Amino acid sequence: MAVAINKKMITVQGVNIQCFDAGNGAATIVLLHGAGVDSAMMSWAEVMRILGENYRVIAPDLPGYGGSDSIDGEYTLGFYTETVKGIIEAFQCPPVVLVGLSLGGGISLNMALNYPELIRLLIPVDAWGLFPKLPYHRLTHWYTRSKLNDNLYQWTGKYPAIVRWSLAYNLFGDKSKVTEALVEEVRDAMLEPEAGKPFISFQRSEITRTGLNTDLYSRLGEIAMPTLLIHGSKDKAVPLKDALAASKLIPNCQLHIMEGCRHWPQKERPEEFARVVRDFIAGQNL
């Protein structure tokens, strides 16, 4: 029988958060999506249905994304970390298996460093923060503060061919996985009035001229819980070399490389992704 995914609104720090909840089991998995115009269901729907066969799985829309509220202040890594802490506490389910993709991976790393008591196992996926600097860091610093970045999402969303190319070039190794339905889903998100603004705020708060405002990289050796890094071998946003280096810095760490994948491995091959997560959890006797 197909796993039902239920929608629930909760309030954390005065912000309404849309959450998706599925399955049942001894372990609870919390899935954090990425940035741009991502959302819980855009990133995690397929994986959630598979993992929900064995575990309870919770996936929130982060503030500013999907069906959750926007805020008037800055979308900093610290703000998102406190939000995720509040979500876990609201569901009364700690300690959890925390899985974070890209931006969500950075949040998960920061959670592990600041609230280790809430996390049983850590699974960063193509994660923000595995590096001291971004590729082409100074150029990226300039771009994030430019008008080009301000207008990128609404402009790109007008042109299906550009959306399709961007997904194939940046997120998927297997171009056949870029379906018309996915192109339309991403376009719809890009054409929302506030599209991209939370991520732009995050970029401007975290990317300094010389590095990152929140230095996760230098603290990777402090992560205490068993950790599994999952990474696409062809990721352009977070190159594989960063995951390889991080896997040697995190004390109790395994690395699974998804060959041929780019920055959205869980979307490209959800069955493999879910199997790797299940095997990791089983190996920890949960």
Where are these regions (language model features)?
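Conserved alpha/beta-hydrolase catalytic His-Asp/Glu region
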Residues: 156-219
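Active-site glycine-rich loops that stabilize anionic/oxyanionic intermediates
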Residues: 26, 34-38, 102
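The serine-hydrolase catalytic nucleophile loop
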Residues: 36-46
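Flexible "cap/lid" loop of the alpha/beta hydrolase fold
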Residues: 113, 121-155
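Catalytic active-site module of serine/aspartate enzymes centered on a nucleophile-bearing elbow/loop
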Residues: 253-286
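Alpha/beta-hydrolase fold catalytic core
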Residues: 1-31, 52-55, 93-94, 278-286
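Active-site loop/oxyanion-hole signature of alpha/beta-hydrolase fold enzymes
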Residues: 20, 45, 49, 55, ...
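Short beta-strand/loop motif that positions the catalytic acidic residue
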Residues: 223, 229-231
